[in-house]
A protein has these predicted regions:
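NTP/phosphate- and nucleic-acid-binding module
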Residues: 1-116
């Protein structure tokens, strides 16, 4: 699986991936990335438009950041995005409008746990 940065020393806490070609996907991904950034979460936003989802996922694996948020096809169908925890392998779908708050809370809890 490769590198898995501990949250307290990772260069970024979260990588936000926008997949597909739908402009709405990129808009939502940017909104979530901005909200996370405003809340003090260190974010790497992959907004490359001419790169396939497979390449983005492979790059995310190589980077090994603690959390990945995927905005893609489920947004249009269900209004959800996916949060992936690198350490545990857990994947969960959350409503797009709650994703920033939930992920911010998750990062803060992980940072707090790492301090003790």
């Amino acid at each position: 699986k490769g590198l898995a940065w501990p949250v307290q020393i990772a260069p970024y806490h979260v990588q936000v991936l926008a997949t597909g070609k739908d402009e709405a996907v990129f808009d939502v991904a940017e909104q979530i990335a901005s909200a996370l950034d405003a809340d003090g979460v260190e974010v790497l936003y992959d907004d490359r438009r001419r790169v396939s989802a497979g390449v983005k996922f492979a790059d995310a694996e190589l980077l090994g950041l603690p959390y990945t948020l995927v905005v893609g096809r489920d947004l249009a169908k269900e209004g959800t995005v996916e949060i992936r925890d690198r350490r545990t392998g857990e994947r969960r779908s959350v409503p797009a409008d709650a994703a920033a708050a939930e992920l911010s809370s998750t990062v803060r809890a992980a940072l707090e746990a790492a301090r003790h």
